[in-house]
Amino acid sequence: MANKQNYYELYRKSTIGEALTDTLEELLINQYISNSLYQKILTQFDKTINEALSNTVKAKTTFKGSLHTYRFCDSVWTFILENAQFKTEANEIVKVDRVKIVACDANVQDAPPPK
């Protein structure tokens, strides 16, 4: 039997992930889809978005800032930077007061349960 790969649900909180979730919840409430289909679609989204980002995004960005907080739990790093500065390959600079960066171990077979 093949190993079932689990994916982080991190991108469900992105703009596209929230739009998908809102749409699916509306369909579920109006009984156009079942709860199992709802879960299956979200699981497929988790898989697809992770694979698409790892295979197609090639742009590089550097960043620096003052480390306010860091945490490591369940193979997930979380950093909160203050007065951060992001620099793109095109030398565009974006400054933000505070940013949260979440980094997940891509080699983890079993993603932790959502919190």
UniProtKB/Swiss-Prot annotation:
Keywords, alphabetical: Nucleus, Transcription, Transcription regulation
Chief location category: nucleus
Nucleus in keyword set: yes
Coiled coil: none
Gene Ontology biological-process annotations: RNA polymerase II preinitiation complex assembly; transcription initiation at RNA polymerase II promoter
Subcellular location: Nucleus
Pfam families in UniProt: TFIIA_gamma_C, TFIIA_gamma_N
Single GO cellular component term: transcription factor TFIIA complex
Molecular function GO labels: RNA polymerase II general transcription initiation factor activity; TBP-class protein binding
Complex and partners: TFIIA is a heterodimer of the large unprocessed subunit 1 and a small subunit gamma.
PANTHER family attached to this UniProt entry: TRANSCRIPTION INITIATION FACTOR IIA SUBUNIT 2 (PTHR10966)
Record's function text: TFIIA is a component of the transcription machinery of RNA polymerase II and plays an important role in transcriptional activation. TFIIA in a complex with tbp mediates transcriptional activity.
Similarity comment text for this entry: Belongs to the TFIIA subunit 2 family.
Protein name: Transcription initiation factor IIA subunit 2
Gene from which this protein is expressed: gtf2a2
